[in-house]
Regions:
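Membrane-embedded alpha-helical segments of multi-pass transporters/permeases
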Residues: 19, 23, 41-45, 114, ...
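Membrane-core helix-loop-helix motifs of multi-pass transport proteins
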Residues: 131-239, 405-441
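C-terminal transmembrane helix pair
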Residues: 186, 342-445
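Alpha-helical transmembrane segments of multi-pass membrane proteins
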Residues: 99-114, 137-156, 174-187, 342-354, ...
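Hydrophobic mid-bilayer segments of alpha-helices in multi-pass membrane transport proteins
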Residues: 7-19, 26-46, 67-72, 230-243, ...
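Long, contiguous bundles of hydrophobic transmembrane helices that form the permeation core
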Residues: 1-5, 180-296
């Protein structure tokens, strides 16, 4: 009993340490996670060199796979940004008369969010919401909240987004399967948490015009944008290649030449590598961008990923310490005695951590470290389902600790209470619906 108390207290204190150092002391999450790693290792009796070796292997093992995918994904996102491909998708969807404006924003967020970091997606796509709000005299909240909810959903549950890819990789989940589940769950959660929730509010949703300081922001001229075909082909190519790999694994005999080729091109690194050169041509060279210009855009994009790479590397270190110290195995036994379904546990831990830390990425890595050790005790629950459950939890409780909360507040010209009442509630509803959809998937599949 005493050993169980020691294990649980070590984990809880480590989490509190991460939260306090990030929220109160303003530590960078990279430093906070490393500090928690050393603390947990020392509490569990690891030697100094043993801790260092575990941290090194954790960072190296995690970034060895993810660094390349994140780097390539950043190039793809940058090409979407500079070419105007994201605006092209939005303008095309606007022509679908049978789609309402709020549903259009959800679809824009889901499609464009595949290649864009969530904050970048908000900054890049919010002018589209401004444009529609002005043309239709619609409250900006009715458009911006569905957009941001969809972007957050894709960020949390659909690889190749870094956090979703990290979770899938650590749990040993099939990437293609997680993509399919994630898109389905993300669509359901975004539609209910965004448009449906806001429609149920009716006249209680206040009218918010485009703030004066953003009134000059607008989408680019349509004639300057790439074609819809080129845009969709570029965005969906890596997803398609990864799905082909999954189909091959399910339906083909291993060892054949075709199987090997499909396994190769469907690997996330290879798929993203191919997609980058397709983007260079379709969204760049074909539109009179020289290689010098493409190099500049690539270098500018890389400047934004140091932050996420360091955080994910430190998350890998924390995971490695939990495993090497024996804490993970002890925790698995303790959690299995709680009689809580692993899907609910995964969702709840990610939800609480996101609210506490303010970062969906950190929350998902922490939840993975806590939940992963107990999965062997539940062979009936697939790692793909747990990966979606963790992402579903991280969608919710976007509050003042999260920079996205303030971004939405600023762009919508909303008060603090209004942002809580409408945006935070929307993300929580989306998270609940994602949990329900995950449970439903687990019963069907």
């Amino acid at each position: 009993m005493e050993s169980q108390i020691w294990v649980v207290s070590t984990l809880l204190i480590s989490i509190v340490l991460i939260v306090l150092t990030i929220v109160k002391l303003k530590f960078h999450p990279f430093l906070a996670l490393l500090l928690a790693s050393f603390f947990a290792g020392a509490r569990m009796g690891m030697g100094p060199l043993e801790m260092v070796n575990a941290i090194e292997s954790g960072i190296g093992g995690t970034l060895g796979f993810l660094a390349a995918v994140i780097g390539l994904g950043t190039i793809l996102g940058k090409m979407m940004e500079v070419s105007g491909a994201a605006e092209r998708i939005g303008l095309t969807l606007q022509r679908c008369r049978w789609l309402s404006a709020d549903v259009i924003m959800v679809l824009v967020g889901l499609i464009c969010g595949i290649t864009l970091f969530v904050e970048v997606g908000v900054v890049l796509l919010i002018p589209l919401a401004f444009s529609i709000a002005k043309k239709t005299n619609t409250s900006l909240l009715k458009l911006a909240i569905p957009l941001c909810t969809a972007l957050m959903a894709v960020h949390c549950v659909v690889p190749p987004h870094p956090a979703a890819l990290f979770v899938a990789n650590k749990l040993g989940a099939d990437i293609g399967t997680v993509i399919v589940y994630g898109l389905l769950v993300g669509l359901i959660a975004s539609l209910v948490g965004g448009p449906l929730f806001l429609r149920l509010l009716g006249n209680r949703l206040p009218f918010k015009p485009v703030p004066a300081e953003f009134s000059n922001l607008d989408v680019r001229e349509e004639s300057t944008l790439p074609s819809l075909g080129a845009t969709l082909f570029t965005v969906l190519l890596p997803i398609g290649l990864m799905l082909v790999k999954t189909v091959a694994e399910l339906n083909m005999a291993k060892g054949g030449t075709l199987y090997t080729v499909l396994e190769f091109i469907g690997n996330p690194i290879t798929a993203m590598f191919i997609a980058v050169f397709v983007a260079y041509y379709m969204l760049g060279i074909r539109r009179q961008m020289g290689m010098g210009v493409l190099l500049t855009h690539t270098e500018n994009g890389f400047g934004s990923i140091a932050n996420i790479l360091l955080i994910i590397g430190a998350g890998g270190a924390f995971n490695a310490i939990l495993k090497s110290s024996g804490l993970a195995d002890s925790l698995a036994v303790i959690l299995s005695n709680l009689d809580m379904h692993p899907i609910l546990l995964a969702w709840l831990v990610a939800l609480i951590l996101h609210a506490a830390v303010g970062s969906a990425t950190v929350a998902m890595m922490g939840a993975t470290a806590i939940v992963a050790p107990m999965l062997p005790l539940y062979p009936g629950v697939s790692p793909e389902i747990i990966a979606i459950a963790i992402g579903s939890g991280a969608i919710g409780c976007t509050i003042v600790t999260d920079s996205l909360f303030w971004l939405v507040k600023q762009y919508c010209g909303a008060s603090l209470s209004e942002t809580f009442k409408y945006y935070t509630t929307a993300t929580f509803i989306a998270s609940l619906l994602a949990l329900a959809a995950t449970f439903l998937l687990s019963f069907i599949i």
